[in-house]
Regions:
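Extended assembly/interaction regions that build large supramolecular complexes
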Residues: 1-175
Length: 175
């Protein structure tokens, strides 16, 4: 069997500034008898002060022991395990992070489509304040739709709290 593999890096930026700095490392290959695979990771990247990171995977297998399709940007639903033959390891969520002294915002998300499922989810964390005092909030959801056997799962969570030192003065959690 003939297999072609490509490995590389993509770097995007504006010289002498940190306005845009994107680093993507990737590897992919094709085995003409079995299928195509491609993986990419965004690392040490930033756009206008917003940090970026995350993983992506693509698989299309038509021969060999595993047959099927998989596209994931940021991983999978927490209750989903890809087929062993798809050769997908732990993936980092696609993430945007803003980190200032008084404001911290983090958004993590994933989207996955496989031969047998559709998955989407996101989680948002916000902190306004200082180390010892502030308001913290979060919200998130996860959805999994599987065709065979039929399965639909959806969960949602949200909460907010006021903290002072190591004490939670007030909190509301849903989910």
């Amino acid at each position: 069997p003939v297999e072609i593999i490509i490995v590389g890096a993509l770097k995007v930026g504006i010289k002498d500034t940190d306005i845009i700095r994107i680093n993507v490392y990737f590897a992919g290959g094709i085995n003409f008898e079995e299928g195509i695979w491609f993986d990419a990771s965004i690392v040490d990247s930033e756009i206008v002060g917003i940090k970026l990171e995350g993983d992506m995977a693509f698989r299309l297998f038509w021969g060999g022991n595993t047959k099927g399709f998989l596209l994931s940007i940021g991983g999978f639903h927490p209750n989903y395990t890809p087929e062993e033959g798809m050769l997908v390891s732990d993936m980092k969520r696609m993430a945007l992070k803003l980190d200032y002294k008084v404001l911290k915002v983090g958004l993590e998300a994933y989207l996955a489509v496989t031969s047998n499922s559709f998955q989407i989810g996101a989680h948002l964390d916000i902190c306004v304040g200082w180390n010892k005092f502030g308001i913290r909030g979060y919200a998130g959801f996860d959805a999994l739709f599987q065709f065979d056997p039929f399965l639909f799962m959806f969960s949602i969570e949200a909460g907010v709290s006021v903290v002072c030192g190591s004490w939670k003065l007030l909190s509301i959690d849903l989910g």
